[in-house]
């Protein structure tokens, strides 16, 4: 067994032991740990920024692009936001131990389901050290142990944050091994983490398509994941065009790099001539490159011809594919063929069309008269999220505290026997 395998085996064993203690942890103890972490992050800002400066300097020397450097940097504001996020998670209801679906059987036996932690969660992520705090806090609050493996470019930052997290756990009388940060940049650690089925119950990858595709191929531990956010807005024949304009513009331009950004606009032929010239001009003036089908280009003079690659692409940038369709069926067929199952929306004043779209479009979130950029756990009232899942099993859509738990059946009786 290599040194990395030995190290990861030890981490996994400690996490499994800690997970049993976390199942018993009280809500008060978990909140105490979270609030202690929030205070320590602010009190140790200088130390955190000194560690972060090492990562930023190395990343700059290695030519990391400006956008990724910005994500990597722990500014005063980002540190304050991490502390505030910890306080917000502490204020959320504790899902562990809640009872649902209670019923009484004819023989008087009481049947219910209890929400319990998943166990040990591995989180694999890139660039952003704030994920260390977000992930640790959500896993802690939901009663799980977690193993965190951040990007190599953020190693010093993540290790420093990990020390703060473990000090908070210790102050609350909780096992420090409930949150462990992998302190090696060796990629073999990731390969080992995603195959440790005896110690890890689920993996949550947060990163680019390349990372998630690799993990999906290598993992023996189940993944909560999404590969792409190829999101659509369909403007129906019965749409309010003022609403449609604002929804489509917001869905594309709110933030280009989020997984809920609209990447393809589908417009019914009956309204294309009235909507596309005005909307296309607004998007063009905002710096968005338009790529359309032949029919759409009639009303998009600045547009370029689209091909199949455009329908399949999550641009994560100022590019939008546009297609004119003749029916809602054609729109839904397009989404079924090219979509990623993330978030899709219809703009319509026709109730039956809205209901049909929500029923038949097989995505983790389906909206009526809303932009796709609302795909976010905070906007859903979850308080915070670990990521967005397009899986069909277990969690689907934004994954908050409840998505990091599962259900077990609990039955109570008075001595009944089965005849």
Swiss-Prot record:
GO molecular function, one term: glutamate-5-semialdehyde dehydrogenase activity
Keywords recorded for this protein, A-Z: Amino-acid biosynthesis, Cytoplasm, NADP, Oxidoreductase, Proline biosynthesis
EC numbers on record: 1.2.1.41
GO CC aspect terms: cytoplasm
Record GO biological process: L-proline biosynthetic process
Primary subcellular site in the record, as a coarse category: cytoplasm
Pathway note: Amino-acid biosynthesis; L-proline biosynthesis; L-glutamate 5-semialdehyde from L-glutamate: step 2/2
Gene3D superfamilies, A to Z: Aldehyde Dehydrogenase, Chain A, domain 1, Aldehyde Dehydrogenase, Chain A, domain 2
Residue stretches spanning the membrane: none
EC primary class: oxidoreductase
Keyword Cytoplasm tagged: yes
InterPro entries noted in UniProt: Ald_DH/histidinol_DH (IPR016161), Ald_DH_C (IPR016163), Ald_DH_N (IPR016162), Aldehyde_DH_dom (IPR015590), G-glutamylP_reductase_CS (IPR020593), Glu-5-SA_DH (IPR012134), GPR_dom (IPR000965)
A Pfam family per the record: Aldedh
Xref: CDD domains: ALDH_F18-19_ProA-GPR
Catalytic activity: L-glutamate 5-semialdehyde + phosphate + NADP(+) = L-glutamyl 5-phosphate + NADPH + H(+)
PANTHER family registered for this protein in UniProt: DELTA-1-PYRROLINE-5-CARBOXYLATE SYNTHASE, GLUTAMATE SEMIALDEHYDE DEHYDROGENASE
Family per similarity comment: Belongs to the gamma-glutamyl phosphate reductase family.
Annotated HAMAP family: ProA
Protein name per Swiss-Prot or TrEMBL: Gamma-glutamyl phosphate reductase
Organism from which the protein derives: Bordetella bronchiseptica (strain ATCC BAA-588 / NCTC 13252 / RB50) (Alcaligenes bronchisepticus)
Source lineage: Bacteria, Pseudomonadati, Pseudomonadota, Betaproteobacteria, Burkholderiales
Underlying gene: proA
